Amino acid sequence: MGPGKADLLDAVARSGSIRAAAEELEMSYMRAWTLIRTMNAAFRSPLVEKERGGSSQGGAQLTAQGRKVLELYRRMETKAGRAIAADWERVKKELR
């Protein structure tokens, strides 16, 4: 799990579609679907459920597990950002 996969989960949650999420993130549908399959296989239960196409065009949604993992990941990102903020300011002072 990393920022790209988290962004993909966010985009699926917003759009209700793997294809729309892929377009939003400027990646191919195949790449998005591969990342989702990888995440679904890595966790105890799937993070994304895909609905069949047809007249309703299908779609996708995050499962409860997907929402939980995404929330935990975003919380970790926030904590990490706060933890390094002071050091990052010191690094920026060294830039030209």
Which role does the model predict for each range below?
Residues L8-L9:
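Short alpha-helical "packing" element that flanks the helix-turn-helix/winged-helix DNA-binding module
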